[in-house]
């Protein structure tokens, strides 16, 4: 019973960490990274489709992303999706390929990105706390039903807290690494 609760807790926390990792990867850091475009969806024949399913995205130079759509008729839609995204990138389109030059980050831009990184990290921690609360509630309900003893409940809550602390440390490390990456370019 308790082991199932802890296993579920770990699965949910791992998913939460993965989501944060993906979000941090998509935040631009002055270097070209295909993951920056992961959240861009293109209106492709009336259906919102992820950009990475419509085109090959490569990094020919450290600050350039090259997009080669498999269907050249989607070029205008891709360009429009990039322009309306919050990335602030201006695509140059030659009809068959599209190039995105990642601008140098100003000090102000870096600070704004770091602020967003910290906010994403804090949101990740809030999600972990909610998962911890759910797990603790399940343990308490087991105690209420007299399925476990008081000592087992305290032990389980202690285990849950230790797991939560380790995942929070992981978030702190991820946020710190991303901040360092942004500020060192």
Curated annotation (Swiss-Prot):
Any one GO CC term of the record: cytoplasm
Keywords attached to this entry: Cytoplasm, Protein biosynthesis
InterPro entries: Ribosome_recyc_fac (IPR002661), Ribosome_recyc_fac_dom (IPR023584), RRF_sf (IPR036191)
GO function term, MF aspect, one: ribosomal large subunit binding
Chief place of localization: cytoplasm
Pfam families: RRF
Domain of life (superkingdom): Bacteria
Biological processes per GO annotation: translational termination
Subcellular location(s) per record: Cytoplasm
Function: Responsible for the release of ribosomes from messenger RNA at the termination of protein biosynthesis. May increase the efficiency of translation by recycling ribosomes from one round of translation to another.
HAMAP family membership: RRF
Family the entry assigns: Belongs to the RRF family.
Protein name: Ribosome-recycling factor
Primary gene name: frr
